[in-house]
From Swiss-Prot:
<dbReference type="GO" id="GO:0006352">
    <property type="term" value="P:DNA-templated transcription initiation"/>
</dbReference>
<dbReference type="InterPro" id="IPR000394">
    <property type="entry name" value="RNA_pol_sigma_54"/>
</dbReference>
<feature type="DNA-binding region" description="H-T-H motif">
    <location>
        <begin position="324"/>
        <end position="343"/>
    </location>
</feature>
<keyword id="KW-0805">Transcription regulation</keyword>
<comment type="function">
    <text>Sigma factors are initiation factors that promote the attachment of RNA polymerase (RNAP) to specific initiation sites and are then released. This sigma factor is responsible for the expression of the levanase operon. The open complex (sigma-54 and core RNA polymerase) serves as the receptor for receipt of the melting signal from the remotely bound activator protein LevR for the expression of the levanase operon. Associates with the RNAP core only in stationary phase cells.</text>
</comment>
<feature type="short sequence motif" description="RPON box">
    <location>
        <begin position="413"/>
        <end position="421"/>
    </location>
</feature>
<keyword id="KW-0808">Transferase</keyword>
<dbReference type="GO" id="GO:0032993">
    <property type="term" value="C:protein-DNA complex"/>
</dbReference>
<protein>
    <recommendedName>
        <fullName>RNA polymerase sigma-54 factor</fullName>
    </recommendedName>
</protein>
<dbReference type="GO" id="GO:0016779">
    <property type="term" value="F:nucleotidyltransferase activity"/>
</dbReference>
<dbReference type="GO" id="GO:0016987">
    <property type="term" value="F:sigma factor activity"/>
</dbReference>
<dbReference type="GO" id="GO:0000976">
    <property type="term" value="F:transcription cis-regulatory region binding"/>
</dbReference>
<dbReference type="GO" id="GO:0001216">
    <property type="term" value="F:DNA-binding transcription activator activity"/>
</dbReference>
<keyword id="KW-0731">Sigma factor</keyword>
<dbReference type="InterPro" id="IPR007634">
    <property type="entry name" value="RNA_pol_sigma_54_DNA-bd"/>
</dbReference>
<keyword id="KW-0548">Nucleotidyltransferase</keyword>
<dbReference type="Pfam" id="PF04963">
    <property type="entry name" value="Sigma54_CBD"/>
</dbReference>
Length: 436
């Protein structure tokens, strides 16, 4: 049999460079887009950004709410001077000897980002050719500086250093941390109460006081707690039951053609200049078209979200419905990946706070009895129930299961409740229990 190999050419659709760039542009958030346009305008004199009014900023307080902080919160950093700089500045008042300065500088550069001493003090002494006693003495001076707890070698030491610096020292708290730290941290409080004679409610108070301390003092320099103001990409308002969306013009910029372009073309410029300007004009036209397409795509998605999540905008978080990217993509005749790129990093200001767009795409709750409850809505109900519980008799996971069904017709398993609770960083009923 005469067999011949034949080469078959398979034609595959190829994305043009302009299309690839347009797809990338769709996924940019406002800051990335602004930077991209600025870079292009440096290379293309025909591109001029249209001036826009500055929109209102959205107030977002860090650690304001468990679910908001995790699912909707976008935290910004505000870098200050480094921890090492601050410690060096404080050391100027300590009158250190040259040897002590050498040890001090070595130790502060051996601190990790949390402010803990990474290196064994005896190893540090060996490296510096000093005695362990000298190194320990300088470490004690380092640990006397601000922030309290700096230079600790363990969480236990960090907390103890801070307790010892409190204006009103609590001997019972210091004793629990120094002699019974593991049992205290594991909340074996009933056993501790029997062994130490400290009442349960007092141990609870001590735990509350310790919770207000800083387990990672070094982060006070890297990520100071602050109130943050965020610029939303979309504003949703509700008036008399009517939901309206407004785009932030800074998040959806437009560009103008430099007014001298046509003048230069009609001024009898040389062929090289005309060719250059023509190429730059094509770049300008592509960018203008891509920005317009980005705006149209996101607007269509927003309008679809308003339709499908109407109850959320009218009633709040607990009314969030299950919704997938594919559902919206199919309805708008878009690819699922297009919707995913379009919502990436975009934020919406609603009457109930600031949220990332991706939040509105929430899966159906596991084994939901009513068939129309999203996992986000169920988490909201769980959070509300736990916030309202009697802390001396916290609700068990099974009781939460029962209340979800009784109050909202939502039927999920105890395991699912535990899973959602863990995702929200809410401790178990035993850990939530108060002893007073």
């Amino acid at each position: 049999m005469d067999m011949k190999l034949q080469q078959v050419q398979v034609l595959k659709p190829q994305l043009t460079q302009e299309l690839r760039q347009a797809i990338t542009l769709l996924g940019y958030h406002s800051a990335e887009l602004a930077e991209y346009i600025d870079e292009l305008s440096l290379e293309n004199p025909l591109i001029e950004r249209k001036e826009t009014d500055t929109p209102p900023l959205s107030y977002h307080k860090t650690n304001k709410n468990r679910m908001n902080a995790q699912e909707a919160g976008l935290q910004l950093s505000n870098p200050q001077k480094t921890l090492q700089d601050a410690l060096k500045q404080q050391s100027l008042d300590m009158n250190l000897t040259n040897t002590e300065k050498k040890i001090f500088n070595y130790l502060i550069h051996s601190l990790d980002s949390n402010g803990y001493l990474e290196e064994d003090i005896e190893e540090a002494a060996r490296r510096l050719s000093v005695s362990a006693k000298e190194a320990e003495a300088v470490l004690a001076k380092l640990q006397s500086l601000e922030p309290a707890g700096i230079g600790a070698r363990s969480l236990q030491e960090c907390i103890l250093l801070q307790l010892q610096r409190l204006p009103n020292r609590n001997e019972q708290a210091e004793m629990l941390v120094s002699a019974h730290f593991d049992a205290f941290a594991q909340k074996k409080w009933k056993t501790l109460s029997v062994e130490t004679g400290i009442p349960l409610h007092t141990i609870q108070d001590i735990s509350d006081d310790i919770a207000a301390l800083h387990p990672r003092p070094g982060l006070l320099f890297a990520r100071p707690e602050q109130d943050v103001y965020i610029e939303p990409d979309i504003f949703i308002t509700v008036k008399n039951g009517h939901i309206a969306a407004e785009l932030n013009t800074r998040s959806f910029p437009e560009i103008d053609l430099h007014p001298q372009y046509r003048t230069l073309l009609s001024s009898g410029s040389c062929q090289d200049t005309v060719s250059y300007l023509s190429a730059k004009y094509q770049e300008w036209r592509w960018l203008s078209r891509a920005l317009r397409q980005r705006k149209q795509t996101i607007t269509r998605i927003i309008n679809e979200l308003i339709t499908r999540q109407k109850d959320f905008f009218l009633k709040g978080r607990s009314a969030m419905k299950p919704l997938t990217l594919r559902e919206v993509a199919d309805c708008l005749s878009l690819h699922e990946s297009t919707v995913s790129r379009a919502i990436k990093g975009k934020t919406i200001q609603t009457p109930y706070g600031l949220f990332e767009m991706k939040l509105f795409f929430s899966a159906k709750a596991e084994a939901s009895g009513d068939g129309d409850a999203s996992n986000y809505a169920v988490k909201t109900h769980l959070e509300n129930l736990i916030n309202q519980e009697d802390k001396t008799k916290p609700l068990s996971d099974q009781k939460l299961v029962d209340l979800l069904y009784e109050q909202h017709g939502i039927q999920i398993s105890r395991r699912t409740v535990a899973k959602y609770r863990d995702q929200m960083n809410i401790p178990s009923s035993a850990a939530r229990k108060r002893y007073k």
